[in-house]
Amino acid sequence: MFQNELQSRIEDLKQQIAAFPPGSITKKKINGKDYFYRRWTEDKKRKEKYIPMTEVETVRQQIEQRRLLEQELKTLKVQLSKSQPEKEIVTSPAFVTNVRTGKSLRVFSASVQKMRKRECYQQLYNFVYGEAQDKVFILYGLRRTGKTTMIRQIFAEMDDNELEKTVFIQITLKDTLADVNHDLKLLEAQGIRYVFLDEVTLMEDFIEGAALFSDVFAACGMKIVLSGTDSLGFLFTEDEQLYDRCILLHTTWIPYREFEEVLGIHGIDEYIRYGGTMSLGGVHYNETSTFATLESTDQYVDTAIARNIQHSLRCYQYENHFQHLRDLYDKNELTSAINRVVEDINHRFTLEVLTQDFKSHDLGTSASNLRRDRKNPTDILDRVDVAEVTDNLRKLLEIRNKKEQQVELDDVHAAEIEEYLNLLDLTQKIDVMHLPNVGIKTQRTVIAQPGLRYAQADALIRSLLLDEIFNSLSLPERNAIQERILNEIKGRMLEDIVLLETKMANPGKQVFVLQFPIGEFDMVVFDPNDAACQIFEIKHSAEVVKYQYRHLIDQEKCAQTEHRYGSITKKTVLYRGENQMVEGIWYQNVEEYLKNL
């Protein structure tokens, strides 16, 4: 490994290590009950902190991960010292926090120079190089959505003079606002102009004292960028401390267009399976996907979402903002409850697919396609009662959901947790309208990170099919049914992806599902200003089948729609095939549609 590569990897490791807690876990028995504590040494003093029972295993894994990273760091430092023994990296003793400046930032940014930039990068760039605004820039979002990478890309574009006026401060669990204030005063005296603070929400007192950044340092001409994964904490900070003195940029939502352009990955199925983070992409970002396995998916939900919410509530208004969730927090069940709500949303989605999406004509089409398959023709779906299997799966899922409810959640708990998930941009609501009964309005809950939903649904179906109730099915039969169900899940997820991205791209229009007593339009885009609408069917298929657009040419459905939503200007089937016109219906490739939004 070359010297600059060693230095770059060392800087990466330091950043990763800072995000994990130091120390070890110890157990104490008090009044016959086991209590767990994290113990570590800081400033030559031993410290310890209580760990709720539900968090012990996660903290244990984090400590082990830190230990492995520290071992790698130690090895690389030895290699670096051998390759350049006369040069030593010295941290200024004047600083309390981990401050990097000047040439070290060039090394820190070296590995991202060839990475493609996210679309929101330009907003960060404009703030850094635009006129001073007496505001701070907040770059926030869930883990692995490109926040720190964008900051490093800013460093990569700076010349040497600009880098000398720039610092990057990596906040750790031990840092406080007083520590940062101390260092910022020193940096201000040195003429530093650009300050980037990463993971600022790790500071326990950040939410209550964040006005320091805008009122003192930004007002004196510093350009300050705050970043971190604790999205909810930043929203609380804006409401409590910063008000109109901050610019917010949220990185959590990654549309298909960016998934393809930034990561260089093509295909809607890849987006369905892995979309939602910047951690899949070969040479561009990390090697493996966050949602490649159920274990990594569950860990992401636990650390990036559940603990995000709990940490923010604990640090906000001196723990006075838990509302009805206080009892769960006091019983150390809040993290588990949040995990459960996310899982419930995805299990309900899977249940809907099993209940609603398995129509006889679809099963017949699948069986026919398998029989005519050129490579591996089979009549396996003719020999299996898929409808009965599906019904058994649905019943089994309902039973499992009840058994797994270890934490009792009432409607108030679930509603409050879902509100926080909405604030994190993890979930979005899509309206479902009804005709001719216009008084009925329901909603779909869409997960903005499709890979998370698919991973949980996929694991659920695979585990259900292993139940003894399906012992009579051979392995090939189970695999065929599994593939069939997963294709249905992909089809429904494709609908949700198109609905969400169309809604986000058209804030001045209404985007919804329109249901009739029999059948529905998968998507309607209604423009109230033009008194007109477009109607869509969304299919996971790459084939053109007349049955797909039967609702679009239904005169009664179209007449009811035009009476309520104005003239229908276009009828479209979005699918995975080539663009073409079929009997007045525009068949458009869904990937092309999403990229052009």
Name these PLM-found stretches:
Residues 569-597:
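Domain-level recognition of nuclease-like catalytic cores that cleave nucleotide substrates
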Residues 311-521:
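Accessory nucleic acid-recognition modules appended to NTPase machines
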Residues 216-238:
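Sensor-1/coupling segment of RecA-like P-loop NTPase cores
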Residues 236-379:
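Interdomain motor-coupling "hinge/lid" segment immediately C-terminal to the ATP-binding subdomain
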Residues 147-148:
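Conserved lysine of the Walker
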Residues 188-210:
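Conserved P-loop NTPase "ATPase switch" module shared by AAA+ and STAND
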Residues 502, 521-546:
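Conserved catalytic cores of phosphodiester-cleaving nucleases, focusing on short active-site segments
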Residues 85-128:
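N-terminal pre-Walker A segment at the start of P-loop NTPase domains
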